[in-house]
């Protein structure tokens, strides 16, 4: 399915955003969001969609990931300077809602060993799930660092009750080509999730944390 955002429009938006950001340097690395307005969609009746897509370039390099690991994974995490918790540490939280909420807030994502992932509802209750941060599985056949990179590269589109959504697709430290590739991939994936594809898209903008929105569609 062809994109309705031409290459020229895409680069115009991305370059406009990066130039505006370069003129006003902020004290932090601004995130770039893709903002989507939908139409001909009834969140009450139509199926709410959700889907994840892996981008080519990591949109949020500072994303914090924690390993909930068995002994082997905890040792590996320690060796790689990755934050981790073992079953004992999770037991100590004692299903305390406040503590579980605090844990969920401290990290952007979690990875868990197979032996632990089954115990999480029992050890922590529904807190991580409620926060939308239930751990992804980390097997011993996978590279831990590779899996962390994969988690950092993956974005999620989730339709809630409103007709607009936004998702982080990059940051202002990226080259325009990298950002354009991420934006393009995100748009095409999102459109594939929609019932009537492009007929459901009202508007598309890219925007950095502090910058003005740039219209793509």
From Swiss-Prot:
GO terms for molecular function: RNA binding; structural constituent of ribosome. GO terms for cellular component: cytosolic large ribosomal subunit; cytosolic ribosome. InterPro entries: eL8/uL1-like, Ribosomal_uL1, Ribosomal_uL1-like, Ribosomal_uL1/biogenesis, Ribosomal_uL1_3-a/b-sand. It comes from the Eukaryota. Transmembrane segments: none annotated. The keyword Iron-sulfur does not apply. Keywords: Ribonucleoprotein, Ribosomal protein. GO terms for biological process: cytoplasmic translation; negative regulation of TORC1 signaling. Belongs to the universal ribosomal protein uL1 family. This is Large ribosomal subunit protein uL1.
